[in-house]
């Protein structure tokens, strides 16, 4: 969940944000699209799937559900198992965004929300790529994902020429060995990332690697 002051605190569901972002991207593409010094474009930096509580995100989530369940609220209720704990919805307009602070949230709702959030990220990247390709005929376009494999958005923007990733082998104490993880790390991370990214399109890129200890 993001708010002002956090990294990547943008709402991809906001039409105003998208409009202004697309204007800026198109101006850049017009200026650099035929520049022989430019070989390619990296969209954003480590785009991710975020819990977005912007009012526009809630409206877009409802539209996402309407399309997925073919405007049939009963189909949604059946899929989400809402008869349990009296969660039944009478209308798509009653549905709110899942709030992580609440106990015992409906996991089907959370899963659909994560799919919605992934689709927002993918669509935003795809639209940026298509804008650039209007002007950049001989330049590739990619983005660099953090390999958060469970978020489901990686590889979901078909306009990209190839997928790229960022990988830090030593960046924390999450290897089960305490703070030694900052020194030892896990070199298998890069092998796993290679195996994950290569099958998506055959070609893939590595945009960030860690040369030593973390510096942020």
Language-model features, listed with the residues they occupy:
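Active-site core of glycosidic bond-cleaving carbohydrate-active enzymes
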Residues: 163-167, 179-181, 186-215
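Polysaccharide-binding and catalytic clefts of secreted carbohydrate-active enzymes
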Residues: 2-189
